[in-house]
């Protein structure tokens, strides 16, 4: 199976609660670029997303290109959640190509758990693609990566 981990696009400054922060126009463009890449190169069959607004907005770019792919909100993939707990829930998802849209630092920690490597930060709207027989710590291999335009 393929697991595609995606960080949300650029979000507005912290002028509202973290869970309510919106994507900037630039962040929308980043999410669109990454969604185009995913749909062009992979065939996602299930989306999992954080409940936070900016992750939901990022997922919307994917859903506009793959409207028949089911999606579910997973409450424990917000920025400071425990990656072990999140991975335990993700392990129950039945999919051949799973896309998970979430945040730093949990996205880096999930990638680290999957491969057994040290955590590495994700750029805004970056995706990393992993292959594994099943979801379990240390069992995945990173196969691909895409980074859209960045603001710096």
Model feature map: region roles:
Residues 82-84, 152:
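Short, solvent-exposed polar/charged micro-motifs at secondary-structure junctions
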Residues 86-88:
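Conserved ATP-dependent adenylate/AMP-binding module captured primarily in the ANL superfamily
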Residues 91-102, 142-152:
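A polyampholytic, Gly/Pro-enriched intrinsically disordered region
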Residues 118-141, 147-151:
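Domain-level recognition of soluble alpha/beta enzyme cores
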């Amino acid at each position: 199976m393929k697991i595609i981990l995606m960080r949300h696009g650029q979000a507005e400054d912290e002028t509202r609660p973290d869970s309510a922060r919106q994507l900037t126009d630039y962040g929308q463009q980043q999410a669109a670029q990454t969604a185009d890449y995913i749909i062009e190169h992979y065939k996602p069959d299930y989306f999992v997303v954080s409940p936070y607004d900016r992750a939901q907005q990022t997922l919307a770019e994917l859903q506009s290109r793959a409207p028949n792919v089911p999606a579910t909100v997973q409450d424990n993939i917000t920025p400071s959640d425990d990656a072990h707990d999140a991975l335990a829930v993700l392990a129950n998802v039945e999919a051949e190509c799973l896309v998970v849209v979430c945040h730093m630092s949990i996205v880096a920690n999930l990638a680290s758990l999957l491969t057994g490597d040290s955590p590495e930060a994700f750029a805004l709207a970056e995706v990393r693609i992993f292959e594994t027989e099943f979801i379990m710590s240390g069992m995945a291999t990173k196969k691909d990566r895409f980074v859209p335009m960045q603001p710096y």
